[in-house]
């Protein structure tokens, strides 16, 4: 017989609160029907890892809503190990090529670039950058139109 179990995970904030201001607390409550109480602990551990770990992601649109040939955003910062997902926002073919002259020393751009075109709206390419520094990238068919970007990895 399945029992209703729940688990709560609280992620403490390290930022001090301003005098007279109430401090907000981040939390996640997971409820699920689980056969064993140990299942609730597993859910709590997974939720904690998702909130505290590299589950954060940066989404970058390939092409703006108005049809402009840009990366949106085109200049952003991520933490080392954070996933960046590039999403085709229009019907134009786009790709994401990291410029070998604009990445940290030792980074192999062939391993992080998506040279194949994303042709349909909604198609995605994801990459995880781990070496801190600045990475320049561009859309091969639209670089001349200004479709270039920069990501800083901390």
From Swiss-Prot:
Membrane topology: Peripheral membrane protein
SUPFAM superfamilies (UniProt xref): Cupredoxins
Cofactor(s) needed by this chain: Cu(2+)
Transit peptide as recorded in UniProt: 1-57
Positions that bind Cu cation: 94, 139, 142, 147
CDD domains documented for this protein: Plastocyanin
Listed Pfam families: Copper-bind (PF00127)
Keywords, alphabetical: Chloroplast, Copper, Electron transport, Membrane, Metal-binding, Plastid, Thylakoid, Transit peptide, Transport
GO cellular component term, pick one: chloroplast thylakoid lumen
Thylakoid as UniProt keyword: yes
Signal peptide extent: none
InterPro entries named among the record's database cross-references: BlueCu_1, BlueCu_1_BS, Copper_blue_Plastocyanin, Cupredoxin, Plastocyanin
Cited Gene3D superfamilies: Cupredoxins - blue copper proteins
Compartment(s) where it occurs, according to its Swiss-Prot or TrEMBL record: Plastid, Chloroplast thylakoid membrane
PROSITE patterns: COPPER_BLUE
Major localisation: plastid
Keyword NADP in record: no
Record-annotated Plastocyanin-like domain positions: 58-154
A GO term for molecular function: electron transporter, transferring electrons from cytochrome b6/f complex of photosystem II activity
Highest taxon above the source species: Eukaryota
Family the UniProt entry places it in: Belongs to the plastocyanin family.
PANTHER family: PLASTOCYANIN MAJOR ISOFORM, CHLOROPLASTIC-RELATED
Role of this protein: Participates in electron transfer between P700 and the cytochrome b6-f complex in photosystem I.
Protein name: Plastocyanin, chloroplastic
Gene that produces this protein: PETE
């Amino acid at each position: 017989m399945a029992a209703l179990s729940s688990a709560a995970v609280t992620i403490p904030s390290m930022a001090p609160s301003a005098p007279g201001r109430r401090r907000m607390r981040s939390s996640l409550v997971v409820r699920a029907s689980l056969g064993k109480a140990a299942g609730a602990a597993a859910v709590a551990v997974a939720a904690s890892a998702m909130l505290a770990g590299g589950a954060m992601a940066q989404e970058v649109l390939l092409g703006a809503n108005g049809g402009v040939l840009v990366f949106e955003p085109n200049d952003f910062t991520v933490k080392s190990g954070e996933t960046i997902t590039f999403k085709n926002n229009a019907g134009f073919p786009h790709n994401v090529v990291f410029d070998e002259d604009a990445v940290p020393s030792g980074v192999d751009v062939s391993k992080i670039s998506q040279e194949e075109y994303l042709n349909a709206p909604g198609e995605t390419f994801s990459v995880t950058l781990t070496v801190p520094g600045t990475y320049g990238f561009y859309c091969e068919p639209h670089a001349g139109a200004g479709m270039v970007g920069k990501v800083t990895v901390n």
